[in-house]
């Protein structure tokens, strides 16, 4: 999902939703092309595996750091380059969760956890022998795992497009809660609509603030001029 110029609004700040499918290769290819349009921001909304036993199915994860085991951008953006969280996006996403769920701030932490998101290119990571990715994810203090978020954030950093990640826990494979067909259908009915409304609300908040606030200095090097 991203903000980009749109023929549907006079102020050219429409919202475009893009289904990127599954996997970091898709995420890279699509964000490579979207970046050419110079969107004001893009958000990753998707499902993830919850890595903490205290998480419940349907909880949200606001990504503030990334473990990059997706491997698709290792040459363009080496792993030693940190991918920082952008305060403007983080605040908008947290406010959007509060607005849509109508939960008081004291209860928000019950359904929204901020933490590290690990992204892998191996769909069967939990079947690998220990120690493997499970140990690395534990060492990184990751709270969620998916296949695309780190790629989208890294490409946002690479192309100077403000980025953010809000995931929804759909299964907990390390704790015996896997996504079975019946459970998945119920989960999708209950959560997908709310998740999308949160993403749209976050973009509306960013739009109300204006694009100038989104042009984060975190995305520019010390020897680089500002550009859109």
Residue ranges and their predicted role:
Residues 25-28, 147-152:
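Short glycine/serine/threonine-rich phosphate/pyrophosphate-binding segments
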Residues 173-227:
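His/Asp/Glu-rich mid-to-C-terminal helical/loop segments that flank catalytic regions of hydrolases
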Residues 92-104, 155, 198-206:
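Generic non-transmembrane alpha-helical segments
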Residues 150-187:
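Zn-dependent metallopeptidase/amidohydrolase metal-coordination segment
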Residues 4-92:
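Metabolite-binding pocket within alpha/beta catalytic cores that recognizes anionic/polar moieties
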Residues 80-139:
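Active-site rim beta-loop-alpha module in soluble metabolic enzymes
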Residues 40-41, 143, 162:
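Short acidic/polar active-site loop segments enriched in Thr and Asp
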């Amino acid at each position: 999902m991203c903000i980009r110029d749109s023929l549907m609004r006079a102020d050219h700040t429409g919202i475009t939703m893009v289904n990127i499918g599954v996997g970091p290769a898709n995420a890279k290819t699509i964000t490579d092309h979207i970046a050419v349009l110079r969107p004001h921001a893009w958000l990753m909304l998707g499902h993830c595996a919850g890595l903490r036993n205290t998480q419940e199915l349907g909880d949200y994860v606001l990504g503030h750091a990334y473990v990059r085991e997706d491997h698709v951008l290792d040459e363009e953006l080496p792993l030693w380059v940190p991918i920082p969280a952008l305060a403007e996006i983080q605040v908008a996403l947290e406010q959007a969760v509060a607005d849509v769920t109508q939960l008081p701030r004291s209860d928000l932490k019950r359904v929204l956890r901020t933490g590290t998101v690990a992204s892998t290119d191996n769909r069967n990571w939990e079947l690998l022998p220990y120690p493997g990715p499970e140990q690395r994810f534990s060492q990184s203090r990751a709270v969620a795992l998916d296949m695309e978020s780190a790629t989208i954030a890294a490409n946002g950093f690479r192309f100077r497009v403000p980025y953010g990640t809000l995931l929804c826990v759909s299964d907990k494979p390390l704790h015996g809660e896997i996504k079975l067909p019946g459970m998945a259908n119920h989960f999708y009915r209950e959560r997908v609509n709310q998740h999308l409304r949160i993403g749209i609300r976050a973009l509306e908040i960013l739009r109300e603030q204006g694009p100038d606030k989104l042009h984060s200095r975190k995305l520019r090097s010390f020897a680089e001029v500002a550009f859109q």
